[in-house]
Amino acid sequence: MNVLSCSINTLIKEGLYEISGVEVGQHFYWQIGGFQVHAQVLITSWVVIAILLGSAVLVVRNPQTIPTDGQNFFEFVLEFIRDVSKTQIGEEYGPWVPFIGTLFLFIFVSNWSGALLPWKIIQLPQGELAAPTNDINTTVALALLTSVAYFYAGLSKKGLGYFSKYIQPTPILLPINILEDFTKPLSLSFRLFGNILADELVVVVLVSLVPLVVPIPVMFLGLFTSGIQALIFATLAAAYIGESMEGHH
């Protein structure tokens, strides 16, 4: 157990700090206190948030009894997110719809912005812009939020009895069950980061090697896989929350 505790502490103190320093492309930073902040991630994240908030305001500003095209689309998205949440969490899915929906929409729009918006042609004094999910810090932050959410879900329903899951079905599995909770955010973050990074790199390489028209099918494939990655992340987040509330694996 001492070895396991030391390994976990080393991962938290050193491993995650080193992961946050992973760079792809040219970055620029803001100095806030004693920390260097990836400024391009904040800028593009604000753009994505502004798109989501602006779209929501336009739709709900004047709701119609007979929905318009925009209202129809957002109602469809809401029903889709509700279905995903109910399927994975169960009958107590209601309070978690906003969280799952926010994850899905933020990741979806972030991924698509990387494929559709020409971030890299915007001239900066140093560095370049890219999709928020093209940065490991964003995906790790989203994964850690998911971890906090499923711990909160389990504790709020079962209290301290939630931790009994670590010794089920036998106390021998305690180290493995603890390790599982650390691998969940890692798998979520690296899956999303790796897929979005790969999509962008493939498009950049093809555009540099062949005429502009040829990479278009690959770009459409990237849009499809970007949407799938957003759905996978949101579905797994809902599944983890449902699992923590039900206490099964």
From Swiss-Prot:
TM annotation in the entry: 40-60, 97-117, 136-156, 201-221, 222-242
GO cellular component: chloroplast thylakoid membrane; plasma membrane; proton-transporting ATP synthase complex
Major localization listed first in the record, in broad terms: plastid
Record InterPro entries: ATP_syn_F0_a_bact/chloroplast, ATP_synth_F0_asu, ATP_synth_F0_asu_AS, F0_ATP_A_sf
Molecular-function GO terms, alphabetical: proton-transporting ATP synthase activity, rotational mechanism
Keyword Aminoacyl-tRNA synthetase part of the UniProt annotation: no
Keyword DNA repair belongs to the record: no
Disulfide bonds: none
Keyword annotations: ATP synthesis, CF(0), Chloroplast, Hydrogen ion transport, Ion transport, Membrane, Plastid, Thylakoid, Transmembrane, Transmembrane helix, Transport
Role noted for this protein: Key component of the proton channel; it plays a direct role in the translocation of protons across the membrane.
SUBUNIT field: F-type ATPases have 2 components, CF(1) - the catalytic core - and CF(0) - the membrane proton channel. CF(1) has five subunits: alpha(3), beta(3), gamma(1), delta(1), epsilon(1). CF(0) has four main subunits: a, b, b' and c.
Protein name: ATP synthase subunit a, chloroplastic
Organism: Aethionema grandiflorum (Persian stone-cress)
